[in-house]
Amino acid sequence: MKITVQKSIIENILIHAQPFLEKKDTSQITSHVFIDASNNRLTLKATDYEIGLIVSTDNLIISQDGNVTANGKKLLDIVRILKEGEINLEVKSDILYISQSHSKFKLPTFSYNEFPVFPVSEGKSRILINSHSLIDSLKKITPSIDINNPKFELNGALIDIKQNSINFASTDTRRLAVVNIDNQSASELSIIVPKKAIVEIQKLFFDDIELYYDENYLIIHSKEYTFFTKLINGKFPEYSRIIPKEIKNTLILQKAKMIEAIKQITTISTDVKITFLNDTIIFESLSDDNIEAKTEINSITGFVTPFIIAVNSRYLLDFLNTINSSEFNIGLNDSNLPFVLNDGNFKTVVMPIVI
């Protein structure tokens, strides 16, 4: 293999590949990227077995077709240190040579035949969804995905595919986030996508996309990328049962005012006590020491008697920071029962702190 490519092009490709590499054990072939130069195209693959990425470009010169693997992190480190302009990559005797002007580097390679085989979309069901709807939905539910939960299914997000709609859901057991979008699908299936995959999808896809899935994999194609992730095998909680069926009190609140008040309290305490009066909402810190914070905003609530809830401020801010509207709804029942934050097709059910 012998190619010449602009630094900016190969650097950008290698940067996108980094999250997909095995970082801890460099003896594993999954710490390497797979590079194929053929048919006037460069194709690069990276995978840690759980998620994988294919990136390709025809913006290069191929002097000799071929394949090679090389440590993805070290190759990026070398490319980064070089100047802007053309970089030469050439394989000789199972060694990858990287050169530019008077600078020369070489990296050992593994047998490219040992590189993992990627799943293919043929024979899998297809989801018709535009990238904006997908990314917007995933962005809203990402903060509620748990990490390191012994119940593996909670370390991912549910994509509940129905014939006329798709529900995106996540929970860390203290809150539940759900986004519902209208969407046509040929078949129904619920899949659980790992959090790492959810995060990477949001970085990659902005243009037209095609989604394919089965019980084991989710595959996404765009003009620039092909992405896959293994799915989590488990049973996601019955999220529809967690959402309160009836709401006693629904308030319309200003997002900016709420964020400002909550952030003032978080300088002292993560947990905040909120008291709803008839025309005022009071915010107070909940802290074990003698440090206190208190602020209030003017807002007509309709409460005749004070209504108090206590909550982890992060749950409120995560919701407020992902919505685009200037106003949102909060649905309240009793102080110690879950309350609901609403913005259009997005809702978050939050368990309050019992005080």
What are these regions (language model features)?
Residues M1-I355:
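Structural preference for solvent-exposed beta-strand-turn elements
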